[in-house]
């Protein structure tokens, strides 16, 4: 029977208006009341979403010959065991998941973390690699051994090894740098703006997931065969701890159906399967031909091509020779889901009906295209991760005599590997990654940035002004006060502010500025991710023609539409964009006006406010070297050309 969940969803594109601390703005009573005066933007409306609305949910339990499946898996396990028995094979799976209980409990309870970092190059890209380890974990895992072991010496199932070689070819420089951390089950955050590097990373992750799932299934089947033989021979003193509470071992979070489809193709290729069950149904629901206009930036084309539906939750069963889409969740090995789809299924605190037991035994959680999911709703991601590795409410046929000890000890989250793939690391991504507690440790790889100051192709005056904020919570009001006093009031007094584009990251920040400017009777327009297409066109035209002197423009609208705004003579940045490409594109608005002859180059100017809490975004814009100086210096303003 379909279950319904009440969620808040805008009429057009769902965006997060509550996920960040900036959402506190909307709780200011006077501002909320005045926001109601304007009806240009389409406010969020409540819609009833049912389980049947989620692609892939509601699948019934399948009638399968489990004994036949187990026999096939056990046969495969015996064949693969011969390959595993080679004395020079390195097996991080065994080191991680079969660690001695007394030792891993001691290491985990110590909670003594140490961090080290190094600067190196991956290919031609300078990077910083940060390693975080538990003090005594090396006695169990010896990560240094993983780092010096050749990829060919790792234990990988022959079919997967062959499939990955056919899909990928020889390891690339990116993959060589990453595989020791990935295959040693360390938490891993990899940030790169290179689409080719992202693809190489994704192929390696697909292989790792396939290896983990097939290895786990074969181990369970092989041990079941042994137990049956022992029972026939009257032997009952042998036990195997090889299972979780429920069957799914891997969670893959992706922003859209197209992203799911593309990663699934990598998984199929890397696993080397011969058969795809329900392939036609999957292709029809997830694949959509057609590309985004090639006039849009490359990263936009990647994010929004194909099927952009963000409401799905799909169970996938993977075996050595076959893959089955639309598997019943409690019979699936992998759960592919959008944050919105899975959050709707999981429910929220206080809901009468919630379903998250199938997330209780996740051993790998992979966040794919994470920055895109941030723009959708980070709250959904946090909710889903928060419901992972909890004790299930029902047994679901679990054989508790075979549940791994770390599940019974309540330590599942300490064994789960979290993998994050992103273009750039934001404070929200940092927060999630910093709070993972995998006892194998974690590795974070981030670029060393040159910055975006000179990308515009001509010299543009760029001014960065620091303001003080005592804390993250104080930053909200401190930023608004600084913006009004330092930027807005001076601009209005001068009387020369026609053609000013004010960039704000989100709708809630736009609301506060909009209400203030309403009170001061300032001529302006405002467009956001909630604006109708008609309103966007109208305000862009009025701004271009000078009939609205100021245009408030949100980063989320830019993310979803990537408009090229004309008539810009000055750019004012309320809060730095996390995506450095946005900053570059804001500068291009100015250079276009110069090229059009409507703006003197000497008059083109971009002004931005920043605080110590903006240093990650600032680093990507001014460069790694400059941001260190700006962070330590006592100066309040910095100017670049």
Curated annotation (Swiss-Prot):
Subcellular location: Nucleus, Nucleolus
GO biological process: maturation of SSU-rRNA from tricistronic rRNA transcript (SSU-rRNA, 5.8S rRNA, LSU-rRNA)
Origin: domain of life: Eukaryota
Chain coiled-coil ranges: none
InterPro entries: UTP25, UTP25_C, UTP25_NTPase-like
Major subcellular site: nucleus
MF terms in GO: rRNA binding; U3 snoRNA binding
Sorted UniProt keywords: Nucleus, Ribonucleoprotein, Ribosome biogenesis, rRNA processing
Amino acid composition bias (Basic residues), ranges on this chain: 1-12
Annotated region (Disordered), positions in chain: 1-22, 34-93
GO cellular component: nucleolus; small-subunit processome
Acidic residues: bias regions: 41-86
Keyword Ribonucleoprotein: yes
Assembly and interaction partners: Component of the ribosomal small subunit (SSU) processome composed of at least 40 protein subunits and snoRNA U3.
Task of the protein: DEAD-box RNA helicase-like protein required for pre-18S rRNA processing, specifically at sites A0, A1, and A2.
Family listed: Belongs to the UTP25 family.
The protein's name: U3 small nucleolar RNA-associated protein 25
Organism (species): Yarrowia lipolytica (strain CLIB 122 / E 150)
Gene that this sequence comes from: UTP25
